[in-house]
């Protein structure tokens, strides 16, 4: 249409050689008329790069992973990368299939918030043969950069806060006990209680699944059995569920029961009462993960030893925790 060779068109599209203004105008006019889009596949074969990054998360409905993904996407976009987003639904088989698809797409790097048992997962990720950053938990046997919050320290700070408010009968709602994140957060809870020589009441640690509904059911069990004056929930969603369980029983938060979560997702600011929590900006954590991967891609996949970036958590005190008060006698509650 422009009356020029394929080579000349290539030079115009890629700005690889000088082309006269008249020829450039003809080629660009033809491009507009034909709605021509350069082949990313062809470019990637020549450059051996696609400017794409794969992201695999275990649960896209969890606001934590939505905020994490937003931070990753923003940082990648600022550096000229697009993100392929995959949700594994906590299913190791689905996760493995996504990893294969991403590898077929010739991604430049991979960020994984993982699901599954370490041994199998380590081999699956190693087989991806791409620069890799793991978010949230270390995977034994895998040489990869790691970005995570200090889970144990965060749980310790949350529990210590409740103890400093005078609470002793404290319940703990944990995620699935077979996950590394849950184990670290439970360990922080236990350490804080032990430091103050406060016994953990039998049945005070209730297993859940990191969801609002799971937190609701776990808190309901605690209120029916242990009757804690405070609850540490292993993430904010379970903390929100605990708020609901308390309200249904006529328990005032924080007057009758203090509740603190973990993660500091944006949603926790808008509950009533606003949920006290511990954590760090989830979006900033995503940005850090993306930047770590971009640096790894730029320096070559094996240019340096694997890095471990652990973010220090902080207490975010809002309206759902308060000083312990002795329960009022039945019939005398204001």
Where in the sequence are the language-model features?
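Bacterial carbohydrate/catabolite-sensing allosteric modules
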Residues: 33, 71-82, 97, 103, ...
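N-terminal helix-turn-helix DNA-binding module of bacterial transcription factors
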Residues: 1-51, 333-334
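Amphipathic helical "hinge" segments at domain boundaries
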Residues: 21, 36-109, 187-190, 194
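Short histidine/acidic/glycine/proline-rich micro-motifs that form metal-
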Residues: 59-62, 89-90, 116, 175-180
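Residue-level recognition of specific faces of alpha-helices
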Residues: 8-11, 15, 30, 41-44, ...
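Short, conserved catalytic or interaction motifs in soluble domains
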Residues: 14-15, 36, 88, 115, ...
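Short beta-strand segments enriched in small/hydrophobic residues
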Residues: 6-11, 45-61, 161, 169-176
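Short beta->alpha connector loops
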Residues: 89-92, 113-118, 237
